[in-house]
Amino acid sequence: MSLLKLCKGDLLTRVLATGTFDLLHPGHLHYLSEARKLGNELYVIVARESMIKHKPKPVIPENQRVTMVNSLDVVDKAVLGSETNIYEPIKNIKPDVITIGYDQKFSSDSIEKNLEELGINAKVVRINKLSDCSLCSSGKIIDRILERYC
């Protein structure tokens, strides 16, 4: 907690967002902006390539993805996730709120249960999809590129 916040008497609410963030697009910006509104400090865990099992491997290498996410004004700090345990970096960050995207396969209830077992008291919030966005997925961007150039 910053000294400025302590002096002002403001409560710091640390929000944690997670994701792959391959081929950054408006959907990612919506997700992170909405997550930021839930608190006054936004941390982001960028998934390691070795931990992504539910979809194709990212096009952009993990070090470049975390650098891009770190460069966004809405983000206070982005870090790479663990290569063995998804909850490891969460213990270090100590969030008050954890956000998950509309398309993430995790159940809010199961995450909260796992967090509770680890002694982490954080609320889990699912962020809604950005409406009216035809290219709000890395897969759709890749499909469009293939359509136009192959």
UniProtKB/Swiss-Prot annotation:
Its cofactor is a divalent metal cation. GO terms for molecular function: ATP binding; FMN adenylyltransferase activity. GO terms for biological process: FAD biosynthetic process; FMN metabolic process. It is an enzyme of class 2 (transferase). The keyword Plastid does not apply. Keywords: ATP-binding, FAD, Flavoprotein, FMN, Nucleotide-binding, Nucleotidyltransferase, Transferase. Pathway: Cofactor biosynthesis; FAD biosynthesis; FAD from FMN: step 1/1. It catalyses: FMN + ATP + H(+) = FAD + diphosphate. It holds the Pfam family CTP_transf_like. ATP binds at residues 20-21, 25-28, 103. InterPro entries: Archaeal_FAD_synthase (IPR050385), Cyt_trans-like (IPR004821), FAD_synth_RibL (IPR024902), Rossmann-like_a/b/a_fold (IPR014729). Catalyzes the transfer of the AMP portion of ATP to flavin mononucleotide (FMN) to produce flavin adenine dinucleotide (FAD) coenzyme. Homodimer. This is FAD synthase. It comes from Methanohalobium evestigatum (strain ATCC BAA-1072 / DSM 3721 / NBRC 107634 / OCM 161 / Z-7303).
